[in-house]
Design a protein with these regions (language model features):
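Charge-rich, low-complexity N-terminal segments
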Residues: 1-121
Length: 121
């Protein structure tokens, strides 16, 4: 089967968070990793300023199913697809969901790949 990669950016709806942010992240990552293990999906989740950026990779159906779940998450809005394409290899082959908190904004603002993702209104 062909590998597929999707990347999206979305704005966080802080009023929909039920737990303090660190607890919300831990709970969400546990759920994501459990689901990804069953689905064969890998990827990364970056928390940047008021947004998250997520990369998902795996077989097309499983990746698109995951994107559909994200689109229905009440904690997110303004979801914007960045990459949707076949992939020759996985960028995160050993990570059910890599996570990095870049909320200070400085690291992301200086990163040549991340900055354009944040410059959208």
């Amino acid at each position: 089967m062909e590998l597929y990669r999707a990347c999206y950016r979305s704005r966080i709806k802080w009023d929909k968070m039920r737990l303090p942010l660190p607890d919300e992240i831990d709970k969400t990552l546990l759920r994501i990793r459990r689901i990804n293990r069953k689905a064969g999906v890998t990827g990364a989740l970056l928390l940047v300023d008021q947004h998250i950026i997520q990369v998902l990779e795996g077989h097309t159906g499983q990746v698109l199913d995951t994107v559909y779940c994200v689109m229905n998450d009440p904690r997110l809005n303004d979801i914007e697809g960045i990459i949707h394409e076949p992939a020759d290899f996985r960028l995160f082959p050993n990570s059910l969901m890599f996570f990095r908190d870049l909320t200070d904004g400085r690291a992301a603002a200086q990163h040549e790949v991340l900055r354009p993702l944040l410059d959208h209104p």
